[in-house]
Amino acid sequence: MISKKDISFIQPSRNNLKYLKWSYDSIRKNGGSEPTICVADDFSNDGTWEWCEDMMKKDPNFKAIRNEGPKRLGHTILYDELVEIADTPIVGIY
């Protein structure tokens, strides 16, 4: 049987803090605190990384990585990196 602890949601982002907050709230509302949420920030300048740092302190099932730039990596590369940090057998793209 699959448990919520077996699931990670991965989400790359660039300057999309409003959507990240919405998706975080949606996952937590519907899945509780057990699924892991993994975010990759692609050199944002809208406060995304600061929010991610704060969430990593508050939520033990939240992980984030950051592209320090200045060149963007893009979603494809970031999805690959997110799959690497997701430590569950099931990974959902969000």
Region spans (language model):
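Catalytic metal- and UDP-sugar-binding loop of GT-A-like glycosyltransferases, i.e.
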Residues: 94
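N-proximal low-complexity "stem/linker" segments adjacent to membrane-targeting elements
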Residues: 1-26
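Conserved donor nucleotide-binding strand/loop of the catalytic core
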Residues: 53-73
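Glycine-rich, basic loop-to-helix element that forms the pyrophosphate-binding segment
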Residues: 68-86
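Short, acidic, metal-binding catalytic loop of nucleotide-sugar glycosyltransferases
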Residues: 25-34
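Short aromatic/hydrophobic "clamp" motif used to bind/position activated sugar donors
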Residues: 91
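A structural signal for isolated positions on well-ordered beta-strands in alpha/beta enzyme cores
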Residues: 8-10, 36-38, 63
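A conserved acidic beta->alpha catalytic loop
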Residues: 41-50
